Amino acid sequence: HQYRAEVVRMKPTYFIEMTDTFGGEANYCWVNRFLVSASSPRGAMRRAAKHTGFNVRNVGCDRWDAVGACVCYFVEWVDPADIQSYRDKYSRIEVI
């Protein structure tokens, strides 16, 4: 079981921004930010979508749109050395 614990610690971290849309484009009238540990960008979005209560679909590259809502998400991989700088840069960032 020690090996399993090591594998869990090695999961990549993803930075996710969730914001409103206007005319189909990201609007940033409001924004929620998350740091998510997951095996892949898709896995990170599954966790974030479950946490925020939306069903989402990938619409290309790093963008995901909420189904039936004017909300979109952007996902990017975070280098482990930069995680603390994200926490310092954004005062309201949730860790999932």
Positions of predicted regions on the chain:
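Short, Lys/Arg-enriched N-terminal segments with co-localized hydrophobic residues
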Residues: 1-9
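Generic structural motif
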Residues: 19-21, 39-41, 78-80
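A short, exposed loop/beta-hairpin motif centered on an aromatic-Gly-Thr core
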Residues: 27-41
